[in-house]
Curated annotation (Swiss-Prot):
InterPro entries for the chain: Chorismate_synth, Chorismate_synth_AroC_sf, Chorismate_synthase_CS
Listed Pfam families: Chorismate_synt (PF01264)
Role noted for this protein: This reaction introduces a second double bond into the aromatic ring system.
Name of the gene this protein is made from: aroC
GO cellular component: cytosol
Enzyme Commission number, as recorded: 4.2.3.5
Binding site for NADP(+): 48, 54
Domain of life: Bacteria
Taxon lineage: Bacteria, Pseudomonadati, Pseudomonadota, Gammaproteobacteria, Enterobacterales
GO BP annotation list: amino acid biosynthetic process; aromatic amino acid family biosynthetic process; chorismate biosynthetic process
Family: Belongs to the chorismate synthase family.
Cofactor binding mode and count: Reduced FMN (FMNH(2)).
Gene3D superfamilies documented for this protein: Chorismate synthase AroC
Binding-site residues for FMN, renumbered to this chain: 125-127, 238-239, 278, 293-297, 319
Record-given protein name: Chorismate synthase
Length: 361
C-alpha cells in the first residue's frame, strides 16, 4: 500500500530519508546457505557512492553497510536480512531556504499535495539517496544469480546529452568515472561536464543494462510479464522518465520482416526483442535502456511559488550531480538483478520440474 516494497518471492523493502539518521532495508526470500559478507555488498555501494569524482555531488558519504540479521557464520540463514547505512555528511542548513518554497522540477510540490507536509532536507524520501539500499539489496541478488545460475548483470552509460557512447569494451566501464565503455568519448564527456559546471546547469543521460545467461522461461503471463516488471523496477529509479526493452521505440520505423528475431538450428539471429518474448525470457541477453532527466537542482534561476501561492524565484544551493545518470548505472543493475532473482525463484517454485525438449542456446 505504501509503495516501499518490490518483489514477491524476493522482496525488498527500503526505509529512510536523505538527511535522516540512517537508511535501511529488509530483504526477504534469500535462500539459506548463500555465502554473504558486508564486503560482498560494499563493492557496488562504492560504485554508487557520492563524492567519488568531480563529476558528481561532493556530499561525502562512506556508505558503509551493516548486516543486522539473516546471516550467521558467513552464510544466509533463509530469514529476513536487515541492512543499514548511516548518514554521516548531511548539511541540512543548505535547505533551510526552501522550507516554504517548491523547487521546480522536484517532488516538493507533489509530496506537499499528497501528505500535507514534507521533509524539505535534501528531498527527504524522494531523494536518490534512498537508492543506496536498492544497490545493497541488488548486490545480494547479483551474487545469487551469478553463483547459482551464471547470470551476469552489468550496465554502462550509453549517452549524456548529445554524446553517445558505443559498447566497445566492457572492461573500460570500471576504468573511468562515467561508466563509459567507449574510451574515445571520455574527453567529450569531460568537456561537457566542465561546461555544465561553469554554467551552473545540468544534463540528461541514457543508461543501458544487460543481463547475460538468463535462463529461458522467466516471467508470468499478462500482468507479471518479465518486461513489465523490469519496466516497473527501472521506472521507479529517481529521475527516470522512460524505459526501453530491446530496440524499444526504434521498432516504430521497422518492418515485421526486419524486427522479428528469426531462429535457426544455431539459435536466434538477432535480439531486437531484448531477450523477452511474450513477457517471458528467451534465453538471449536481456537488454534495457533508461532515460534520466537532467536534475532540477541547478544554479540557473527558475520561477516557482511558495506555500502561499506567491510567485518567487529559485536558485538551488547545496551539493548536487550535474548529471544524475552517471551514478545511476549501479542502481539500474541492482533493479534488474532484483527482478530477475524474484522471477527465478517464482519459476523454480511453480515450474521447477518442467523439462522442455526444445533446444536452448
Amino acid at each position: 500500500m505504501a509503495g516501499n516494497s518490490i518483489g514477491q518471492f524476493f522482496r525488498v523493502t527500503t526505509f529512510g530519508e536523505s538527511h535522516g539518521i540512517a537508511l535501511g532495508c529488509i530483504v526477504d526470500g534469500v535462500p539459506p546457505g548463500i555465502p554473504l559478507t558486508e564486503a560482498d555488498l560494499q563493492h557496488d555501494l562504492d560504485r554508487r557512492r557520492p563524492g567519488t569524482s568531480r563529476y558528481t555531488t561532493q556530499r561525502r558519504e562512506p556508505d558503509q553497510v551493516k548486516i543486522l540479521s539473516g546471516v550467521f557464520e558467513g552464510v544466509t540463514t533463509g530469514t529476513s536480512i536487515g541492512l543499514l547505512i548511516e548518514n554521516t555528511d548531511q548539511r541540512s542548513q543548505d535547505y533551510s531556504a526552501i522550507k516554504d518554497v517548491f523547487r521546480p522540477g522536484h517532488a516538493d510540490y507533489t509530496y506537499e499535495q499528497k501528505y500535507g507536509l514534507r521533509d524539505y532536507r535534501g528531498g527527504g524520501r524522494s531523494s536518490a539517496r534512498e537508492t543506496a539500499m536498492r544497490v545493497a539489496a541488488g548486490a545480494i541478488a547479483k551474487k545469487y544469480l551469478q553463483q547459482q545460475y551464471g547470470v551476469k548483470v552489468r550496465g554502462y552509460l550509453s549517452q549524456i546529452g548529445d554524446v553517445t557512447c558505443e559498447l566497445k569494451d566492457w572492461d573500460q566501464v570500471e576504468q573511468n568515472p562515467f561508466f563509459c565503455p567507449d574510451v574515445d568519448k571520455l574527453e567529450a564527456l569531460d568537456e561537457l561536464m566542465r561546461a555544465l559546471k561553469k554554467e551552473g546547469d545540468s544534463i540528461g543521460a541514457k543508461v543501458s543494462v544487460v543481463a547475460e545467461s538468463v535462463p529461458a522461461g522467466l516471467g508470468e503471463p499478462v500482468f507479471d510479464r518479465l518486461d513489465a516488471d523490469l519496466a516497473h523496477a527501472l521506472m521507479s529509479i529517481n529521475a527516470v522518465k522512460g524505459v526501453e526493452i530491446g530496440d524499444g521505440f526504434a521498432v516504430v520505423t521497422k518492418r515485421g520482416s526486419e524486427n522479428r528475431d528469426e531462429i535457426t538450428p544455431d539459435g536466434f539471429q538477432s535480439n531486437h526483442a531484448g531477450g523477452i518474448l511474450g513477457g517471458i525470457s528467451s534465453g538471449q541477453h536481456i537488454v534495457a535502456h533508461l532515460a534520466l532527466k537532467p536534475t532540477s537542482s541547478i544554479m540557473v534561476p527558475g520561477k516557482t511559488i511558495n506555500r502561499q501561492g506567491e510567485a518567487t524565484e529559485m536558485v538551488t544551493r547545496g551539493r548536487h550531480d550535474p548529471c544524475v545518470g552517471i551514478r545511476a548505472v549501479p542502481i539500474a543493475e541492482a533493479m534488474m538483478a532484483i527482478v530477475l532473482m524474484d522471477h527465478l525463484l517464482r519459476q523454480r517454485a511453480q515450474c521447477g520440474d518442467v523439462n522442455s525438449q526444445v533446444p536452448r542456446w
